[in-house]
Regions:
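A cross-kingdom feature marking solvent-exposed beta-strand/loop segments within repeated
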Residues: 81-96, 213, 217-219
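Membrane-interface alpha-helices at helix entry/exit sites of multi-pass transporters
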Residues: 96-101, 225-229
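Alpha-helix N-cap/helix-initiation sites
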Residues: 54-61, 77, 94, 183-187, ...
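Amphipathic, charged-and-aliphatic alpha-helical interface segments
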Residues: 61-76, 190-205
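Extended, charge-rich C-terminal regions with high alpha-helical propensity
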Residues: 172-174, 193, 201-202, 206-207, ...
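Alpha-helical transmembrane segments and their immediate juxtamembrane flanks
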Residues: 133-136, 227, 231-233, 238
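Short amphipathic alpha-helical segments at helix boundaries and their inter-helical linkers
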Residues: 72-83, 104-119, 201-212, 233-249
């Protein structure tokens, strides 16, 4: 038997729908509303701030939500499907969504870019210097091509990856270029998605974040737009509640405690 909402719960539910849109409400939120209406109310207020300001177009906000809900480590299939459906209803194309997913998949490079420097330090402490050897002609060509395509950008991390495994460097660089070949999203839109991916708590990468912030600014993004990306990404924390509370309700039901 469905429980009747209290006056406060009804008020909170309507506020949530008014702030976030009717498409956002689901049975999951009914469960959270039942157990803790106060957190639903406070979340509706804080998470709707970017929507009310609207520095980013709605389609761009959908790109950000799709990206952060599809990141390995914070994958939220329920939220991802909801944002995809809403994006499609808004007129976003399948190709645009695919490109957002392709950009998000690049997060795998963080393991290599953060791990290789640690390996290099460990090797150096043992008297092994990978950097001492000259790059061969193929490695020099790969480096020159990368620098040319990325406006002069190069880091010690990429240098070390190139030295340790040029085949991997070449293949992953080609993989990274995939979203830039289709041209569906603008350079600015791509960079804002990259910022979201590298600013997510589970995949935070300060160097990559700084690089893509500069690229976004160069592509015409404003400070307000970038701040709004951060605000959207910060809502990732709610997954602890949206995923955890329904499981808590199941446990309570199975133990006949509610």
């Amino acid at each position: 038997m469905e429980k009747q909402l209290t006056e406060y719960q009804q008020k909170v539910k309507q506020k949530f729908i008014d702030d976030r849109g009717p498409w956002k409400w689901s049975a999951m939120w009914d469960t959270i509303l039942e157990l803790d209406p106060a957190v639903v109310e406070s979340y509706a207020t804080y998470s709707s701030v970017p929507d009310k300001r609207g520095y980013l177009e709605m389609r761009m906000r959908k790109f950000i939500y799709i990206a952060i809900d599809s990141i390995t480590g914070s994958l939220n299939t329920s939220g991802l499907k909801g944002h995809m459906k809403h994006a499609l209803q808004l007129g976003v194309s399948t190709r645009e969504i695919l490109e957002v997913l392709e950009i998000t998949s690049m997060i795998g490079s963080t393991t290599y870019e953060l791990g290789v420097p640690e390996l290099m330090d460990a090797l150096q402490q043992r008297g092994i210097s990978v950097a001492a050897a000259e790059l061969n002609e193929h490695q020099k060509a790969l480096k020159a091509d990368y620098i040319q395509k990325h406006g002069g950008y190069w880091t010690n991390e990429k240098e070390n990856i190139l030295r340790l495994d040029p085949e991997y460097f070449e293949s992953f660089t080609a993989f990274e270029e995939t979203p830039w070949k289709s041209g569906v999203l603008t350079p600015k839109e791509k960079e804002l998605v990259y910022i979201a991916v590298h600013a997510a708590p589970v995949s935070l990468n300060k160097k990559a974040l700084r690089y893509h912030i500069n690229c976004a600014l160069d592509s015409g993004a404003t400070a307000n737009e970038i701040v709004e990306v951060f605000e959207l990404v910060s809502t990732l924390g709610i997954h602890s509640i949206t995923i955890g509370v329904p499981i808590l309700k199941e446990a309570l039901t199975e133990l006949e405690l509610c």
